[in-house]
Amino acid sequence: MGNDKTNMIIAIALSLAVLLGWNYFVTAPQVERQRQQQAAQVNPSQGVNPSQGVDPSQGVNASPSPKEGGPSAPVPGTLPGAAGGSPQAALARDEALARAPRVRIDTEALRGSVALKGGRIDDVALKGYHETVDPKSPEIVLLSPAGSANPYYAEFGWVGQNAGPLPGSDTVWTADGDVLTAKKPLVLTFDNGAGLVFRRTLSVDDKYMFTIEDSVENKGPNPVTLYPYGLVSRWGKPHTQGYYVLHEGMIGVVGDKGLQEYTYDKMAKENPLGAPGTRGVSWPGATGGFLGITDKYWAAATIPDQQAPYTGSFTERDEGATKVYQASSLGEARAVAPGASVQASQRLFAGAKEVSTVDAYREKLNIKQFDLLIDWGWFYFITKPMFKALDLFYKLFGNFGVSILVVTLILKLFFLPIANRSYVSMAKMKAVQPEMTAIRERYADDKVKQQQAMMELYKKEKINPVAGCWPVLIQIPVFFSLYKVLFVTIEMRHAPFFGWIRDLAAPDPTSIVNLFGLLPFTPPDLLHLGVWPIVMGITMFLQMKMNPAPPDPVQAQVFTFMPIIFTFMLGSFPAGLVIYWAWNNLLSILQQYWIMRRNGVKVELWDNLRSTFQRRTQVKTAKG
């Protein structure tokens, strides 16, 4: 049973090593290849012209109805005439913005503009976030217009039949003001000259939520049928982090279907949907939720009326060598009789995935499961409370690094009864180690009798041989939950600790390989070995030396090299996670020392260290 315990610990450690190592040797090269491929692509400029003849039953990306618009009629989110067009060179972002008259967006959190030509929200930058820890570095740009290198925008409007010209990418709206603020909405109007007057009221709060209220008044002699839609479109596959613990790509909660997550690679494998060259998935008859595109820290999502049924869809389509990703919702038919009007209300989230902000939108706006916009992972029930605890102590101490230390200490105290029983059992096993060795020697050729004798010894001394596994097993979900919090929550981004750690979500910037910056080169990730990873490795080594070496020489070698392996593996992990592990190891050493002394068991740390270094000295002398 003692060997079973050791084997279990080794298996867990090796499993962790495989999972962590996968990112180094498999995922990272794939991500780099994708980045190089994307850099070689030329992004086409594009516009949008909502169709006069869309079959609404097929969703926003549906092919035009031949009876109404003909085979070349444009569709929302597509490039008019794209089938026969050729890609154009991308413009600089400022040049692309200058191609259309605009109304400024200016709030506490956002700056940007609304394009009057097309009526899109296609220019959004985040005031409170910068590209690096330097506050003078450029602000994060989230949305960009058609024609730029990385088009990413939101579009809202109507599709329908027998309605005449509908607002599209070439439509120039009339605005009632020159700025959109949290206190001053913007009203856009357009008369299609065929009896329909379109009015759009745009408002924005002091964070990242836009409200789009569309109305159509029918002044013509005939009834029309219209379908409201909202979409988020992204041209070109973006550079992704490429980690298995993080979702990047299409995301949504679609009515009763719940959370839907599709990576960019997964979209390429979907079945054809709608227009030729388009792949995707759709969910008709949904009510409530959202659909969008998410990055690690940022997202853009269209939010349909939470009480009205809609068809949701994720699509990928080909525009030359460029992939276009789109998340969209298409509402049900709205009949507009002569002299009548119809309204549709939708929202757009475009900003940082701040936990408090996202949670507040879910509660105040009643957006179904909107908090899942943040990728809390499988351990949601642990990960989110973990963040809440860290955030609580951050508000008390003003430092997330200190918060990590405090939460780790509280977790240690919370699990103290389990750990105490575990360490007491381990201490007792150390006390009977001579008897266990004698049993192994006495029944060396009879494993059955050896096990029976061991069990009798455990029963006599009241030892639980698997109790030592509990601290390791308990730490695994806590470790991954903290890793998830550090990795996906924007609150940890650019959060400093002390000294040289200016970003807990980034690796320790120092490296022993270049003598902590004295040598003028940057080592590769695999050789990136900062101060905190070294401290973690030392504490892990000391923790293992608290116990005698396993009798099996193979296991002893595994235990010897494990701290070295983990030191290199965690070298490129978030500094906050490495600090947690080092601090947790130190607390475990102190806890085990106290319990062993309390139970009258000799602490063999110094003896084991002395034995280890003496043995290595003897080996070197023998070789010499």
From Swiss-Prot:
Membrane-topology annotation of the record: Multi-pass membrane protein
Cited InterPro entries: Membr_insert_YidC, Membr_insert_YidC_N, YidC/ALB3/OXA1/COX18, YidC/Oxa/ALB_C, YidC_ALB_C, YidC_periplasmic_sf
Protein name listed in UniProt: Membrane protein insertase YidC
Record key words, sorted: Cell inner membrane, Cell membrane, Chaperone, Membrane, Protein transport, Transmembrane, Transmembrane helix, Transport
Subunit: Interacts with the Sec translocase complex via SecD. Specifically interacts with transmembrane segments of nascent integral membrane proteins during membrane integration.
Keyword Transmembrane helix carried by entry: yes
Similarity remark: Belongs to the OXA1/ALB3/YidC family. Type 1 subfamily.
Function in brief: Required for the insertion and/or proper folding and/or complex formation of integral membrane proteins into the membrane. Involved in integration of membrane proteins that insert both dependently and independently of the Sec translocase complex, as well as at least some lipoproteins. Aids folding of multispanning membrane proteins.
Disordered, as annotated region: 36-95
Coiled coil: none
Keyword ATP-binding: no
Pfam families (alphabetical): 60KD_IMP, YidC_periplas
Intracellular or extracellular location(s): Cell inner membrane
Comp. bias regions, Polar residues: 43-64
